[in-house]
Curated annotation (Swiss-Prot):
Protein name: Rubber oxygenase
Gene label: lcp
Keyword Magnesium: no
Cofactor: heme b
GO function terms (MF aspect): heme binding; metal ion binding; oxidoreductase activity, acting on single donors with incorporation of molecular oxygen
């Protein structure tokens, strides 16, 4: 499958040949056959090509050229000036990069401002749940996604995981920000920069022997399937868990929250034919692309330890066992084992019993419950975590890499 790109596939095999090639590749990589229909997408139609073999034909050649020309340091310096959606691009950018960025910053025609506003308000209103699930649910689940763990670990960002996690948190904050897609917001900027980072990693990581030896046969990282795996570990997982916890979510708020993530996927370069149009479609796609691929890797376990170490800095490690137990409760014991979360049987049983009561109280469904004091300690620790990583004042520079992780 060397050099297997969407363009080459369509040129050399035709539809029937492509299906055969994709089926063989799926078996080799132990991936389920791609059967999700584009009729369930925001586009409503599509050619149905497996996103495993679709990358970013707009961004990838441009960023490869920028890297090969040695322009990354100068470009990063210029891009530090670009922080708001309504800002003009900085002067001095290479022409091909400027052209790409001007195109990439355009919102999709189907974006609904009212839905985006409502979705952002929902994220703010449910901030304690959304923030905790992003960080201690989705963030830790990402370490059980082998490709994501290895792409992070062996890329330049893997050398400074605290900075890498902060940048990931920045994306989560910007998506949920009340001003995310407004002129004075910054989500368009964050999305375009992240899309360029992904393109740079696709160019660089295949040059890493360490990544190539552990990639499971993948020749180019961060396919559109990989992006949607991450998307589901965030959007679909968070909505599913909130409903399981008994958080009150009405239909309009759920649809608005989904719309925020639909627009964000588009802005990150995902083809509209892979973006679910409804939560039912999202759950169906998640069961196909996310659930079967969760697994243990040494890289993922190492990243879990780094993340929990950062959380421990909040209070010198006093609540680390509690946070670990909450994460196991949130992710489930199977995923907890995959990523090396220590078992905390007593705390896990306590949280499983009392956390739903605490949620019901916060949602105004029951009076103040009689829960162990440790649960209030947990809630306070979660609030500190959310404030630390989703703080508006935390300005993070998203830089394009020009090297892999140093060996």
């Amino acid at each position: 499958m060397d050099g297997f790109s969407r363009r080459r596939m369509l040129m050399t095999g035709g539809a029937l040949g492509a299906v055969g090639a994709l089926g063989a590749a799926t078996r080799a990589l132990a991936r389920p056959l791609w059967t999700w229909s584009p009729s369930a997408s925001v586009a409503g139609t599509g050619v149905g090509v497996d996103p495993e073999y679709v990358w970013d034909e707009e961004a990838d050649p441009v960023l490869a050229a920028v890297i090969d020309r040695g322009e990354v340091p100068a470009v990063n310096a210029l891009l530090k000036q670009w922080t708001r959606n309504d800002q003009a691009l900085p002067g001095g950018l290479p022409g091909d990069l400027r052209e790409f960025m001007e195109h990439a910053r355009r919102m999709p025609s189907w974006a609904d401002k009212a839905a985006l506003d409502r979705g952002a308000q929902f994220s703010k209103t449910k901030g304690i749940y959304v923030g905790a699930l992003y960080g201690l649910g989705s963030g830790l689940m990402s370490t059980a996604i082998p490709r994501e763990s290895r792409a992070v670990y062996y890329s330049k960002g893997g050398a400074d995981m605290k900075d890498r996690i902060a940048k990931t948190a920045r994306l989560g904050y910007d998506i949920g920000d009340l001003d995310a897609y407004l002129p004075h917001g910054s989500m368009i900027v964050t999305a375009v920069k992240t899309r360029m980072v992904h393109a740079a990693v696709r160019h660089l990581l295949p040059q890493s022997p360490a990544w190539s030896q552990t990639s499971g046969g993948q020749k180019i990282p961060i396919s559109q399937a990989d992006i949607m795996v991450t998307w589901h570990s965030l959007a679909t997982f968070v909505m599913r868990k909130m409903k399981q916890w008994g958080v009150r979510v009405n239909t309009a708020d759920a649809e608005a929250y989904l719309h925020v993530w639909q627009v964000s996927a588009h802005m990150l370069g995902v083809s509209d034919e892979y973006i679910p149009a409804t939560w039912d479609a999202a759950n169906a796609q998640s069961k196909q692309v996310l659930d079967p691929i969760l697994a243990h890797t040494p890289e993922g376990e190492a990243l879990t330890e780094v993340l929990l170490g950062i959380v421990a800095e909040l209070d010198a490690g006093l609540t680390r066992p509690l946070i670990g137990a909450f994460s196991r409760y949130t992710l489930g014991g199977e995923v907890g084992d995959m990523i090396g979360l220590a078992k905390q049987p007593v705390l896990e049983r306590l949280i499983a019993t009392a956390w739903p009561l605490l949620v019901a109280f916060r949602e105004g469904l029951i009076p103040l419950p009689a829960v162990p004091a440790v649960l209030w300690t947990l809630e306070e620790a979660l609030r500190k975590f959310v404030l630390l990583f989703l703080s508006e004042g935390r300005r993070i520079a998203i830089d394009i890499p020009d090297v892999n992780r140093p060996s």
